[in-house]
């Protein structure tokens, strides 16, 4: 948030100093919190902590503050923190209430191009749909308040920032691994969702600038972390305490038997799905109808009303409806990296089911819900490359390495 002595350049949307006249002392003055305020509504001043910095020669990091604090009541006190709406929906309110920020981004990208600087943008929030464009199907199946759908940026967000000159953007917040892109005749924007180090799948990204038009992204998975189990004895005490309270759901103690950090994170996801996601996200009747089914049952349901020869179904019995739901969350969290944790045979069987339910024209409510589920699974398992890949901005494409 603040300039360092070693920085070659540092500025904010409110600092008019150009790089040609840059000085660290001036940057320190401009970095003062009181000098980074704007009126979100008349009489309501709030901070915008965006900045651009050149930490190493010819690389500009553009930190965009996507938080937009909008007052609830214009007649109330502007200094009352509780009179402001939260900023958790991300970029959507930037378009209407932080137009100065968009203009500043345009100026920065133009200046970077003029001076042959590589510009890398980042913020807490995504610029592009992080559900591999399955958000409309997720809303139809689960409702508009599930799977963080309120945080999915409007398409206008990508359009505006792409036209402003942003080419690559890194985001967090969702704790998921994903790559999204938007292409027009003139622009190409890539949004990289960086996974969390403390959730499935634990990983970080390495960016290599190969040329002005090419960048390489590599995802490093944390399979092993020293002392990851050091606090397990304390969790065992928590488990024993939960056992004494019949009103509280208890997690599976077997998680404390995990042998690696990655295994721990996968078990953690499994418990999140069981204890939180299924009860909170999914229609109760849908789960009740599906919970006793296995893969073969789903296959036969998919064939209902379809004039097709039924394939060998015996191997579909190896997995259950619960496995399907968990695998869906694996893909939501880890994108293509989830394939490491799903048997190859089952992945092929999912492809068969995706095709069957896409073809199925039944009006039965449960079949329609399954149809939507497999459509979502297809989206999440076939997104842009998100493990090790190259972005070619000139050709406007992303390819696996």
Where are these regions (language model features)?
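Extended active-site neighborhood of metal-dependent phosphoesterases/phosphodiesterases
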Residues: 1-103
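Non-catalytic terminal accessory segments
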Residues: 134, 227-401
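Active-site-proximal beta-strand elements of phosphoester/diester hydrolases
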Residues: 59-68, 188-195, 218-220
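Short Pro/Gly-enriched beta-strand edge/turn motifs at strand-loop
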Residues: 27-37, 163, 185-191
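His/acidic metal-ligating clusters that form di-metal
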Residues: 54, 60-63, 71-184, 248-253, ...
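Short, solvent-exposed aromatic-acidic interface loops
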Residues: 218-229
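Active-site-adjacent helix-turn-beta-strand microarchitecture at beta-sheet edges
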Residues: 1, 43-47, 170, 179-185, ...
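Hydrophobic residues embedded in beta-strands of well-ordered beta-sheets
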Residues: 60, 214-215, 398
